[in-house]
Regions:
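Bacterial Sec-dependent N-terminal signal peptides
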Residues: 1-10
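Extracellular adhesion/glycan-binding regions together with long Ser/Thr-
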Residues: 87-158, 256-311
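Serine/threonine-rich, low-complexity linker/repeat segments that form flexible spacers/stalks
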Residues: 5, 18-45, 168-227, 236, ...
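Surface-exposed loop/edge segments in extracytoplasmic proteins
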Residues: 200-202, 246, 257-267, 343-344
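Low-complexity, serine/threonine/proline/glycine-rich extracellular segments that form mucin-like
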Residues: 44-84, 218-253
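Bacterial N-terminal signal peptides
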Residues: 12-18
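Ordered hydrophobic segments in well-structured contexts
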Residues: 49-57, 127, 141-145, 149-173, ...
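Serine/threonine-enriched low-complexity regions used as flexible
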Residues: 44-46, 148-149, 153-174, 217, ...
Length: 377
């Protein structure tokens, strides 16, 4: 059966996390084999692993579509009927072969981002690994030489190992040379402390024992999380022993233009105390946001500000003279987030860098001046 129009579906490219950017590039299925067919991925990260799997093959002589050698077609048919594609799920129920699937997704102009991401995710679970073609890297470009024209699932197979990386899966229509530039938007975290004299937010505070010290944690949200069934997003905060947490967390939400989004009803889950799953870090509290639900209800949300205060207690380190590297009462935070939509264990998470702010606390020194007591701090 001839197919002159076939949607080129680019599935969600994940930016640990996250961030994530899902795009759709619609085009025509190649009607002839260009001879030399390759995928060129422009990526400055030279430590990644990219693989390609042929999903649909089109015989150049007859212009007919069949399953590619990199996919288990029967398994994909079953998966498409159960993967919850919002718009086209009922049509897939009657699909029997590659041609049927091609006909359904050739009208993909009205697919949602979630549909597009789920299609790639379904295909990712049905690949034949022994039939993959692995990219070779040179000068910031990964080249995958594929055997013939057709539709390929390109998978970022890089092992994350808990570092700040992200994985992606995308479907491309390949005829000749097809260029790809991965778009990764990962969440970020910054932390600030309010100075007691000028009310400015910064890296260093200057307070006395007994003061309530204010803190602000700012985190960004990936531009698209549609590839994930669930997206982990947890702010982890560690107070030094000189602080007592006041348990007064509040939140503000903003769009990409910095406009505050008010009346947000999708609240986070907060736990005061340590998380046993982070063995190398002792939390004072951690906050988990349901990013999928938040984005569903507030599609423009791009940033979260988390506010709280803590009291400087009698265990605070005191700098007698000038601030030093020891007596500085540190406060550290970082963010853990999902970075692989193909992960079924929920354990493949990325981490932002740990950000630390300090409060230098000075002692009160009493001096006798002509019968009057004075002090300096």
């Amino acid at each position: 059966m001839k197919m002159k129009k076939f949607a080129a579906l680019a599935a969600a490219t994940v930016m640990s996390v996250s961030a994530i950017a899902a795009t759709s590039a619609f085009g025509v299925f190649a009607t002839t084999d260009a001879g030399v067919n390759n995928i060129v991925i422009k990526d400055s990260d030279t430590n990644r692993v990219y693989k390609a799997y042929q999903i649909f093959d089109q015989a150049s002589a007859t212009n007919t579509i069949k399953w590619g050698q990199g996919i288990n077609g029967d398994a994909l048919l079953t998966k498409l009927k159960t993967s919850g594609l919002n718009t086209y799920m009922s049509q897939f129920d009657s699909a029997e072969n590659a041609v049927d699937v091609a006909k359904i997704i050739s009208d993909a102009d009205h697919w949602t981002k979630e549909d597009t991401a789920k299609l790639a995710k379904a295909a990712s679970s049905c690949i034949i690994d022994s039939k993959s073609v692995t990219a070779h890297e040179a000068n910031g470009e990964y080249t995958i030489n594929v055997p013939s024209a057709g539709y390929y699932l390109v998978v970022d197979a890089t092992e994350n190992n808990g570092v700040d990386k992200a994985n992606s899966a995308l479907i491309l229509n390949v005829s000749g040379t097809t260029d790809v530039t991965p778009k990764r938007t990962k969440p970020t975290l910054t932390k600030q402390i309010k100075h007691n004299e000028n009310e400015a937010w910064g890296d260093v505070g200057d307070n006395a024992i007994g003061d309530d010290v204010e803190f602000k944690i700012t985190t960004t949200i990936p531009s698209d999380v549609s590839a994930y069934d669930k997206y982990t997003y947890t702010v982890r905060d560690q107070l030094s022993e000189g602080f007592t947490f006041n348990d007064n967390l509040t939140y503000k939400y903003y769009d990409a233009d910095g406009q505050e989004i008010t009346s947000v009803t999708v609240g986070p889950n907060t736990t005061v105390g340590d998380d046993s799953s982070t063995t190398d870090y002792k939390e004072s509290f951690y906050v988990t946001f349901d990013i999928k639900e938040l984005v569903k209800n507030y599609p423009t949300v791009a940033k979260i500000e988390t506010y709280y205060s803590a009291k400087l207690n009698e265990k605070a380190k005191v700098a007698v003279t000038a601030p030093d590297s020891v007596n500085n009462n540190p406060n550290t935070a970082y963010l853990t987030y999902s970075n692989n939509p193909q992960d079924k264990t929920g354990k493949e998470n990325g981490e932002t860098s740990k950000i630390t702010v300090y409060d230098w606390t000075f002692s009160l020194v009493s001096n006798k001046v002509e019968g009057r007591a004075s002090c300096r701090c």
